[in-house]
């Protein structure tokens, strides 16, 4: 039974997402970008539109005769771009220019005048979201899904190791190469560098947002909800679930219902999830952020699972290997130790019903 009072509190929170969660935006701050990151507008050529959103349009184009993706912020009203939007653009450019990883889109340059323009490498395979939509109702091959999940985990492992929280991890922000063998993380507009103080602003997209970013209790003015980098782990769990089921989490439900479901411990059904992988999902979407594993642990676990899947098959998927090895010693996490123990047990006895050693999904799973 849904508590009407809880829904009212949630609706107030969702209608004013930035009101009581801290002040990431400040209109008084001057927006500036390192000149080394700026490129000459006259060296850009626009091609066909790749995608269009409420605040930007992405084109295929050329920079010095090299194919690129060109994102223009609010092209129809460039003279009236809000200070908040300019600051978001500055953060995205600054952070994207810092990161260099094989599973993160490559930054090429930016322009400030006459419009805000971000130029990155061109990913001709489109978004993961579009790929999944186009293949429904069929589920991707398990090796394919796991290799993509591993690529995402490696990208997030790199970001967290460098103190960066993405905060908007979802299929539409994951891009594919033309041959669909490599996946890369994009859109750093909501990303932040994790300071000593925890993050306090609600951000992200509701279906992939962690429960600690919602509240079914009224929040007093001046009181802030705190969260840390583990919100990305929760978002990853939803993407992994999508890769394994090719379904949208909480499909057909409004933002307010999704927020209520998440805040009250409801999770998508794991009925069709392979028993070896279900414990990973349950740990990643645990209500308590402290119970969620780090991405380093997730990468190691996925590597082991993928290795076993490939060994039992006659052919192996195209798995992208980064320059550095991720076969690192696992941190001494009780949650991940339990997860690995469960995986070993499942490998020994395939027909045994999987017993999740983390927080179980809500009995009223959606």
Where on the chain are the PLM-derived regions?
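Catalytic-loop of the protein kinase fold
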Residues: 160-176
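Protein kinase glycine-rich loop
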Residues: 47-54, 58
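Activation segment signature within eukaryotic-like protein kinase domains
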Residues: 148-149
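Short beta-strand micro-motifs within the conserved protein kinase catalytic domain, predominantly
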Residues: 106-114
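Regulatory alphaC helix of protein kinase catalytic domains
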Residues: 89, 93-94
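A conserved loop-to-beta-strand element in the N-lobe of protein kinase catalytic cores
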Residues: 113-121, 129
């Amino acid at each position: 039974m849904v508590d009407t009072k809880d829904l009212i509190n949630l609706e107030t929170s969702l209608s004013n997402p930035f009101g009581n969660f801290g002040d990431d935006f400040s209109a008084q701050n001057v927006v500036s970008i390192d000149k080394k990151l700026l490129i000459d507008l006259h060296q850009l050529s626009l091609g066909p539109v790749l995608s269009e959103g409420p605040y930007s349009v992405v084109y295929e184009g050329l920079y010095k005769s090299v194919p690129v993706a060109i994102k223009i912020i609010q092209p129809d009203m460039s003279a009236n771009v809000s200070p908040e939007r300019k600051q978001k653009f500055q953060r995205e450019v600054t952070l994207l220019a810092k990161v260099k990883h094989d599973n993160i889109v490559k930054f090429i340059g930016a322009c400030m005048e006459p419009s805000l323009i971000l130029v990155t490498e061109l990913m001709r395979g489109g978004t993961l979201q579009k790929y999944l939509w186009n293949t429904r109702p069929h589920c991707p091959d398990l090796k394919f899904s796991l290799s993509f999940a591993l690529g995402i985990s490696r990208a997030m492992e790199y970001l967290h190791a460098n103190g960066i929280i993405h905060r908007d991890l979802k299929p539409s922000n994951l891009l594919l190469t033309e041959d669909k063998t490599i996946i890369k993380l994009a859109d750093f507009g909501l990303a932040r560098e994790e300071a000593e103080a925890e993050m306090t602003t609600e951000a992200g997209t509701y279906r992939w947002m962690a429960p600690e970013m919602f509240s079914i209790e009224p929040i007093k003015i001046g009181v802030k909800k705190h969260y840390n980098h583990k919100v990305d782990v929760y978002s990853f769990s939803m993407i992994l679930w999508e890769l394994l089921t090719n379904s949208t989490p909480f499909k057909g439900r409004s933002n307010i219902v999704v927020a209520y479901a998440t805040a009250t411990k409801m999770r998508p059904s794991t009925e069709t999830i392979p028993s070896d992988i279900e414990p990973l999902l349950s740990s990643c979407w645990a209500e308590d952020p402290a119970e969620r594993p780090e991405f380093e642990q997730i990468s190691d676990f996925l590597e082991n699972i993928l290795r076993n899947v490939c060994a039992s098959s006659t052919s192996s998927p195209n798995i992208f290997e980064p320059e550095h090895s991720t076969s690192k010693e696992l941190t001494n996490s009780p949650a991940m130790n339990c997860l690995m123990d469960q995986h070993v047990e499942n490998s020994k006895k395939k027909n045994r019903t999987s017993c999740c050693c983390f927080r179980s999904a809500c009995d009223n799973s959606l």
